[in-house]
Amino acid sequence: MSGNKMKMEFLSKSQNESFARVAVAAFISQLDPTMEEITDVKTAVSEAVTNSIIHGYGDREDGIVKIQCEIFEKDITIIVEDDGIGIEDVKQAMTPLYTSRPDLERSGMGFTVMETFMDELRVESTEKNGTRIIMKKKLKSIE
């Protein structure tokens, strides 16, 4: 199989998180991933989208979350992007158990979860200009 890609965007409403992970899972299903690989990708997408909604936009439900997904052979690249408040200190934000919203019952493990389930994670952010999360995963061939 050669390459394929898709883009979508949706409002920063928490109910759209499940839509996003199911849409990405459906898109990558053309690569015939294992159930474990699908679960890994869905979990990482869920964490990235949740971060955009909760941390990027806070209580605003009119923000836009964008997802791009590209596949080439067995390689998947997923980009989750928002135009929210951005991250002041990306390195600190990626520290396990750190949260910028202690008022919420969150564990501060979102980036750690993304790193665990994906092969590569890169976070680009500018304060007041949003965040871009780039995740990559190479699927194992079942042959």
From Swiss-Prot:
Enzyme Commission number(s) from the entry: 2.7.11.1
Alphabetized GO MF terms: ATP binding; protein serine kinase activity; protein serine/threonine kinase activity; sigma factor antagonist activity
Catalyzed reaction equations: L-seryl-[protein] + ATP = O-phospho-L-seryl-[protein] + ADP + H(+); L-threonyl-[protein] + ATP = O-phospho-L-threonyl-[protein] + ADP + H(+)
Superkingdom to which the source organism belongs: Bacteria
Record-linked InterPro entries: Anti-sigma-factor_SerPK, Anti-sigma_F, HATPase_C_sf
UniProt keywords, alphabetically: ATP-binding, Kinase, Nucleotide-binding, Serine/threonine-protein kinase, Sporulation, Transferase
One record GO biological process: negative regulation of sporulation resulting in formation of a cellular spore
Pfam families listed in its UniProt record: HATPase_c_2
SUPFAM superfamilies: ATPase domain of HSP90 chaperone/DNA topoisomerase II/histidine kinase
EC supergroup of this enzyme: transferase
Keyword presence, DNA damage: no
Functional summary from the UniProt entry: Binds to sigma F and blocks its ability to form an RNA polymerase holoenzyme (E-sigma F). Phosphorylates SpoIIAA on a serine residue. This phosphorylation may enable SpoIIAA to act as an anti-anti-sigma factor that counteracts SpoIIAB and thus releases sigma F from inhibition.
Family: Belongs to the anti-sigma-factor family.
Name the UniProt record assigns to this protein: Anti-sigma F factor
